[in-house]
């Protein structure tokens, strides 16, 4: 018998969105990737780095990438840590803050991977629900768990919490509030200023969505230097390879390209939302690069299968709270036009 830890043997694990090997034969709208390529400057930086210098270890501190992030976000580099995807930061925050039997919390529905990461550490998981108006329910006036994860904008629903609400929540926690801003570049507000105002707020970002670098696995966190120092103690000492560091620095430096990609996605999101509503779909106003939409018959499974049969991938969740709808990533205008055409063919249902 292999001597696995009991909690590892019993846990279900996280299931990511379907990634077909023949990806180019699909319209892929199921994992919130960017429909546009990375900045040409990113590709140039990667090509320049992909030489004989790869025999050398990368900079363990990711200094050039952190310096570019400092310019973009307005923080000293000592407040920033680069990561192998924002998931690495989320994992290390749990490792740093929540021991076996200690509690972490998050809103359900949101990013369920928080729970998986906590299970690995043997931490207890507590979830709080949402009202029909998307107000969190049941959070105590003073919550003493070790970590509280808040996905803002929410995924998979796309709505945002106000900065006033987030500040109030930070003041009610004895532990760390992690504001997961994976999709914030498609929204209007960020919690970065709360990092300066509260010593228990951490903001995480990813390069997978707005910077078109899902394939590189890049992320970062911004927090007080003492939190960053703790995370640096437990991360892989060479957590970003040379190519990833070059890509991150170049992506952050090319803000005009980044802003134009975001503009086009937001424009397409508005158009697609209006088209869905004309078809009778209920669409939650979204601040992400996706929308959550329910068909007139509230049969998300029917629409998911119908789109799949037409080589269009979207995300359907089996959670009863979500099964009536679909999360649909915002692709190019052409991809979304083909998706609307397919939805018209599928009709409103019974």
UniProtKB/Swiss-Prot annotation:
The keyword 4Fe-4S does not apply. Pathway: Amino-acid biosynthesis; L-histidine biosynthesis; L-histidine from 5-phospho-alpha-D-ribose 1-diphosphate: step 7/9. It catalyses: L-histidinol phosphate + 2-oxoglutarate = 3-(imidazol-4-yl)-2-oxopropyl phosphate + L-glutamate. It holds the Pfam family Aminotran_1_2. One of its GO terms (molecular function) is histidinol-phosphate transaminase activity. The modification N6-(pyridoxal phosphate)lysine is found at residue 209. The keyword Transferase applies. It is an enzyme of class 2 (transferase). GO terms for biological process: L-histidine biosynthetic process. PROSITE patterns: AA_TRANSFER_CLASS_2. Its EC number is 2.6.1.9. Its cofactor is pyridoxal 5'-phosphate. Keywords: Amino-acid biosynthesis, Aminotransferase, Histidine biosynthesis, Pyridoxal phosphate, Transferase. InterPro entries: Aminotrans_II_pyridoxalP_BS, Aminotransferase_I/II_large, HisP_aminotrans, HistidinolP_aminotransfase, PyrdxlP-dep_Trfase, PyrdxlP-dep_Trfase_major, PyrdxlP-dep_Trfase_small. Homodimer. Belongs to the class-II pyridoxal-phosphate-dependent aminotransferase family. Histidinol-phosphate aminotransferase subfamily. This is Histidinol-phosphate aminotransferase. The lineage of its organism: Bacteria, Pseudomonadati, Thermodesulfobacteriota, Desulfuromonadia, Geobacterales.
């Amino acid at each position: 018998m292999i001597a696995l830890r009991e909690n590892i043997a019993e846990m279900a694990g996280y299931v990511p969105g379907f990634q077909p090997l023949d990806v180019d034969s699909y319209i892929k709208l199921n994992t919130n990737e960017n429909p546009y390529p990375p900045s040409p400057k990113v590709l140039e930086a990667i090509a320049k780095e992909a030489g004989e210098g790869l025999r050398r270890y990368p900079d363990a501190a990711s200094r050039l990438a952190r310096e570019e992030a400092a310019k973009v976000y307005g923080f000293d580099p000592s407040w920033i840590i680069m990561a192998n995807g924002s998931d690495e930061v989320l994992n290390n925050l749990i490792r740093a803050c929540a021991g076996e039997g200690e509690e972490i919390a998050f809103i359900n529905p949101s990013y369920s991977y928080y729970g998986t990461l906590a299970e690995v550490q043997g931490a207890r998981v507590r979830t709080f629900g949402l009202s029909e108006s998307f107000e969190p329910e049941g959070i105590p006036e003073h919550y003493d768990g070790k970590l509280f994860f808040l996905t803002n904008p929410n995924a998979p629903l796309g709505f945002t919490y106000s900065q006033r609400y987030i500040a109030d929540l930070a003041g009610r926690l004895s532990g760390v509030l992690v504001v997961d801003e994976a999709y914030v570049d498609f929204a209007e507000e960020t919690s970065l200023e709360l990092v300066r105002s509260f010593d228990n707020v951490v903001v995480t970002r990813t390069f997978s969505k707005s910077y078109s670098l899902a394939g590189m696995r890049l992320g970062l966190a911004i927090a007080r230097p003492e939190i960053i120092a703790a995370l640096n103690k437990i991360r892989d000492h060479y957590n970003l390879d040379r190519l990833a560091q070059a890509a991150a620095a170049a992506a952050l430096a090319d803000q005009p390209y980044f802003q134009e990609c975001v503009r086009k996605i937001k424009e397409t999101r508005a158009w697609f939302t209006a088209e869905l509503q004309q078809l009778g779909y209920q669409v939650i106003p979204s601040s992400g690069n996706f929308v959550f939409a329910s068909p007139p018959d509230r049969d998300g499974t029917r629409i998911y299968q119908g789109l799949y049969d037409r080589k269009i991938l979207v995300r359907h969740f089996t959670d009863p709270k979500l099964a009536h709808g679909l999360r649909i990533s915002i692709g190019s205008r052409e991809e979304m036009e083909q998706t609307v055409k397919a939805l018209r063919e599928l009709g409103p249902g019974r």
